[in-house]
């Protein structure tokens, strides 16, 4: 089993509004810095990573449960599953992103990835509460 870390942020906005903002690739691109340069091509979506590599990205279909799971397909590597949820929390919501430590990932890289996700979720909070 892979090690996991779930990073959360509480947002003072109705969960449905946050979900609607995040559920499209265009919405993701506004706050998720790791998915910069999202483009729709003939075979689906792709993103340019911070390292400059273009990788295919799949997004879960729209749903009524606040599930925002997505998958990255780096060249020459196994597909990476990125589970994400938006849940109601009284008048606001909590966004949860579960980071799965990939095989061979160092402690330092796992910690850096978790910090990156936390920064992106803080950016999402800022945008949604503005």
Show where each model-derived region lies:
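Hydrophobic ligand-binding cavity/cleft-lining segments
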Residues: 1-39
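Short beta-strand-to-loop capping motifs
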Residues: 11-13, 49, 72, 101
């Amino acid at each position: 089993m892979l090690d996991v870390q779930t990073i959360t942020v509480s947002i003072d906005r109705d969960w449905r509004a946050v979900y609607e903002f995040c559920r499209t690739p265009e919405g993701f691109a506004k706050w998720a810095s790791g998915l910069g340069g999202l483009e729709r091509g003939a075979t689906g979506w792709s993103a340019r990573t911070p390292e400059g590599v273009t990788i295919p990205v799949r997004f879960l279909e729209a749903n009524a449960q606040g599930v925002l799971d997505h998958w990255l397909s780096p060249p020459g590597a196994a597909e990476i599953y990125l589970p994400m949820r938006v849940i109601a929390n009284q008048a606001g919501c909590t966004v949860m992103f579960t980071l799965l430590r990939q095989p061979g990932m160092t402690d330092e890289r796992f910690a850096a990835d978790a910090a990156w996700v936390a920064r992106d979720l803080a950016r999402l909070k800022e945008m949604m509460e503005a």
